[in-house]
Design a protein with these regions (language model features):
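Carbohydrate-active catalytic/glycan-binding domains of CAZyme proteins
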Residues: 1-147
Length: 147
């Protein structure tokens, strides 16, 4: 069993459990370093989805320097080495409720459409940025997509 979490100042790390999740031992290395255009402030809140026959997809939140938070994604064949995708999958600005930040997501699988690709609903925290410092009112929002 592998657990992914954020370690402040380092990015997303992982730990393994050999006892069904009662205890974990941190693995060496960083899975997602906060070193890209969209996550240079921090990378946090990982959510992992297994892709049939293709490894894993991680969704995670990233802060850029301007107090903006986007939802980002990376893929991996083994769960250890991750390749970041070049653009966010969800960015602020979709509506007045998420004008400044999109973060802390949770992915839910929806019933498949007949002969269609899997469908997912992403529930996430959204901030309107109406207060000083890109702060403001936080709400729960959602979006749907096929993976």
């Amino acid at each position: 069993l592998r657990l992914y979490c954020c370690r402040r100042g380092h990015g997303i790390i992982s730990a393994l459990s050999g006892d069904g999740g009662l205890t974990f031992q941190q693995e060496a290395g960083v899975r997602i370093a906060p070193d890209g255009q969209w996550d240079q402030g921090t990378a946090f809140a990982p959510e992992i989805v297994r892709i049939a026959g293709a490894g894993y997809r991680m969704y995670y939140a990233g802060y850029s320097t301007a107090g903006r938070a986007d939802i980002l994604t990376a893929t991996s064949a083994d769960g250890l080495r991750w390749e970041k995708q070049s653009r966010p999958v969800l960015s602020p600005g979709g509506g007045p409720w998420d004008a400044a930040k999109c973060s802390e997501m949770c992915l839910l699988r929806l019933p498949d459409r007949e002969l269609g690709a899997p469908r997912y609903r992403m529930v996430y925290e959204a901030c309107d940025g109406t207060a000083p410092g890109h702060r403001g009112v936080w709400r729960v929002a959602s979006a749907t997509s096929c993976v």
